[in-house]
Amino acid sequence: MSITREKKSELISEYCLKKGDTGSSFVQCAILSERIRNLTEHLKTHKKDFHCRRGLMVLVYRRRNGLQYIKKKYGDDQYLALIKRLGIRDIFH
């Protein structure tokens, strides 16, 4: 269910803004998106896992707030590029 250290370092290197960037909002949204994908796959087989479902909703809320921050701070162009790279829908348009 959780992402491995190797996968996390791949995401950090792919979405970082500069070398050594591990905590920017772009990286955080990418890591949250991967965790959301993992939990979604888990819930496909374990439909009654309501504790996991609540955790998924918390992660979705955190990612939405991060995306909202990116859109406000960096503009529509970088926001749209990020959601295209992540493969998620635009929820603000």
From Swiss-Prot:
GO cellular component: cytosolic small ribosomal subunit
UniProt keyword terms in alphabetical order: Ribonucleoprotein, Ribosomal protein, RNA-binding, rRNA-binding
Source taxon at top rank: Bacteria
UniProt name for this protein: Small ribosomal subunit protein uS15
Keyword Ribosomal protein attributed: yes
GO molecular function: rRNA binding; structural constituent of ribosome
Entry-linked SUPFAM superfamilies: S15/NS1 RNA-binding domain
